[in-house]
């Protein structure tokens, strides 16, 4: 996937060597953007194999408004284990903010769907996970923050906005096209970004379907985009591999409510990636 490999090259060639919260050290850039036309295939990195099951179940978990890893673990997903407390709780992280902002029954996802259906020209179709009132105290442990009703981690993918392009009648288009732009304040390029691309591309496709729209673009905008010092070798290996054609994601066309999707409603076709590459998570 050229856009992703171009990002990797850009950071390796132009990045600033910096320290970081985890003590691992990074090479990073500030401000970068990638664009993916979803009509050209599903943007799933092919220069290493991704664990699609984790991507889908995590997104469904967000949409449920869940913040306990029990659902993830029951479905074989371990990507949040390092940050949960002894009960599996993570505090008011993504799902809580998306569906129950400040515990005041502000359901941003439901409000977004309503706005897309009734006022698609709106410039206010934004979902925010960045809530300063629940950001963790950096001097305290994950467990202490959760006990104090704070998030175990601040959101990396902070907020996203949707845009509906009117159909081009001269081209025979009958439906508007839905595009999504994500602002990601902090991006782990080797481990996190491939997941984030696939997750938000999939979310865009799901919302387009339930709003009777066609998927347009996924636009990925970064703040601090970084490569951890212990991931250089893995990314050089990816750069040495020839990208393969993008797969196609098929959604169950019977689903008309964003909250009715289940794991079996997604079928990825023609995904033929290079072998997986292991890398340590910076905690």
Swiss-Prot record:
Active site (catalytic residues): 156
Keywords, comma-separated and alphabetical: Cytoplasm, Methyltransferase, Nucleotide biosynthesis, Transferase
Single Gene Ontology MF annotation: thymidylate synthase activity
Major site of localization recorded for this protein: cytoplasm
Coiled coil: none
Pfam families from the UniProt entry: Thymidylat_synt
GO cellular component, one term: cytosol
Reactions mediated catalytically: dUMP + (6R)-5,10-methylene-5,6,7,8-tetrahydrofolate = 7,8-dihydrofolate + dTMP
InterPro entries the UniProt entry points to: Thymidate_synth/dCMP_Mease, Thymidate_synth/dCMP_Mease_dom, Thymidate_synth/dCMP_Mease_sf, Thymidylate_synthase
Pathway as given in its UniProt record: Pyrimidine metabolism; dTTP biosynthesis
Enzyme class: transferase
Enzyme Commission identifier(s): 2.1.1.45
Subcellular location: Cytoplasm
Biological role: Catalyzes the reductive methylation of 2'-deoxyuridine-5'-monophosphate (dUMP) to 2'-deoxythymidine-5'-monophosphate (dTMP) while utilizing 5,10-methylenetetrahydrofolate (mTHF) as the methyl donor and reductant in the reaction, yielding dihydrofolate (DHF) as a by-product. This enzymatic reaction provides an intracellular de novo source of dTMP, an essential precursor for DNA biosynthesis.
Family under the similarity heading: Belongs to the thymidylate synthase family. Bacterial-type ThyA subfamily.
PANTHER family: THYMIDYLATE SYNTHASE, THYMIDYLATE SYNTHASE 1
Subunit structure: Homodimer.
Protein name: Thymidylate synthase
Organism in which the protein naturally occurs: Flavobacterium johnsoniae (strain ATCC 17061 / DSM 2064 / JCM 8514 / BCRC 14874 / CCUG 350202 / NBRC 14942 / NCIMB 11054 / UW101) (Cytophaga johnsonae)
Lineage: Bacteria, Pseudomonadati, Bacteroidota, Flavobacteriia, Flavobacteriales
The gene coding this protein: thyA
